[in-house]
Amino acid sequence: MRLLLSVLLLLVASLGLVSAVPAGSSITPPPPIEPIQWLSSRSTDSRRPWIRVRDWVIESIWGISKDASHHRSVKASPRSRSPSRSLTRYGSDVVLRFHLRNAEEAEALAEATDVLFLDVWTSTSEFVDIRLAQEVIPSLLGLLPDSLRTAYTPLIDNLAEMIYATYPTRRPAGFEDQPGFIPSMRQSTQFGDLFFRDYQPLSVIVPWMRLMASMFSSHVQMINVGVSHEGREIPALRLGRTRGQTADPYPRKTIVVVGGSHAREWISTSTVIYVAYSLITRYGKSQQVTRLLEDFDWVFVPTLNPDGYVYTWESDRLWRKNRQPTSLHFCPGIDLDRAWEFQWDGERTRSNPCSENYAGTEPFEGTEAHQLAQWALNETQTNNAKIVGFLDLHSYSQQILYPFSFSCSSVPPTLESLEELGIGLAKVIRLTTHEIYDVTAACEGTITADDQARNSPPQRPIFPTGGSSGGSALDWFYHQLHTDYAYQIKLRDRGSYGFLLPSEYIVPTGKEIFNVVLTFGKFLIGDLAQNTDLDWDAELQRTEPDEAPASQGDGPAPATQQVLQADVDDEETEWVENARSEFRRR
């Protein structure tokens, strides 16, 4: 079974690498690629059994004809062609990091970015990253106070090249002695890692999900949580014991993990898939993972925004919003993480459909956000489920954010438990992969305020255009569905690559969030997890020495994380053993 799984995953990956040619390109592709040689010493005839396996997979599981698959196999991947398309769109673009020192600077920068319709990549209490064309830099600086005109550093000056580098490279998917084998994968013991050495388009992700559900039907079910504006299903994998196996008068505890709300955040989609795969293949082999899938249903949504995700592969790699029309036909799209009903603040942005943060004209106008909300309500109201955990994966800046996002003046009733678990999640990342993730309220991670006096006027810079605010999925699940543990996790890195994180970081980032999920589930199991002989730490995934290097950031870690880093030698399970949250009394 393991050998068959490896073959099927390799086939999925090899088909996916050639399906990502941007549509409408005028570039002539190179000559057809020769069929992949699985073993260089074998003749063509000796490979016929593998061809039959491939054809069976294509025809029986994916519904793709042999002729169609052959047509796809001779097309060139994006990186096999010259990057003229990216150069045309992004040739003069750069990413600058502005360092904020006071509220006046933050407000001036926010106003300038609104006037010039600039793309704010991320914002924290210390800096704001902005993408803009080089020729626009003088105009931006002219709108800023003198103190900000020299308070910036260039992060990315070769944006077009970095965009192209994120697309898959056409390499033979063979054994480690074959040409094109990636040396960093030699130590991997997981066949699935071959699938995760590149980002994958939706045309590969959906068949892969279908394959997982077919091969692991005892604990995996493929579902869809809605339909996008352009008519695509929003696919998801449900992991856990089959419903109805045992009579259970209590609602089934469910944890939802979502990625890809913002189309350009490819690492979030790949990370959701990696974590799902790790749980799927460890069920029945790992007592810890088996326990998690027996105690909870896990619903993994790789991309909530399939229309936008497809658009990033076919047209614009840095597209953020969904693809539904607005009042301005040349500015389509709604920010799905501002479109939720709770504390929707579209009054600030609905007059500007060209804004990257456009919230629509009314709550839930964003189709995909409304679809997920309807699915979640249906699960809790009619399907005997209680959503007890919500993890919303984004990029970038390495932050673990808890409610509320809309305002720092409103304190969540379970604040201590949220902080406790959030610090525990950051700690397990630091101990296993040595990466530092900040832990704070979402309002502070995106529109920063004084974290010592939540009800007093903000003392640190406020930048109101970055990240979430009102209308976020995080706040809606926590407040409307009473999901006790809801987090938005911003993945790697801290700005060296931003949304263009190289594919060699997929597996290390996936390991970090797998460890987060393992720790998250252990915490929700509660005291019962401590009263067993299971060694939860033994199941944690650690970064191998030859894997991708640590993420590079700009500047030192925030003071709060320096305190956490000094706490490495504390008892690692103390935060779980002392937990007495409302969750376990409900």
Curated annotation (Swiss-Prot):
Glycans are attached at residue 378. Its cofactor is Zn(2+). Zn(2+) binds at residues 262, 265, 394. Residues 577-586 have a biased composition (Basic and acidic residues). GO terms for biological process: cell wall organization; proteolysis. Residues 198-524 form the Peptidase M14 domain. Inactive carboxypeptidase that may play a role in cell wall organization and biogenesis. This is Inactive metallocarboxypeptidase ecm14. It comes from Aspergillus fumigatus (strain CBS 144.89 / FGSC A1163 / CEA10).
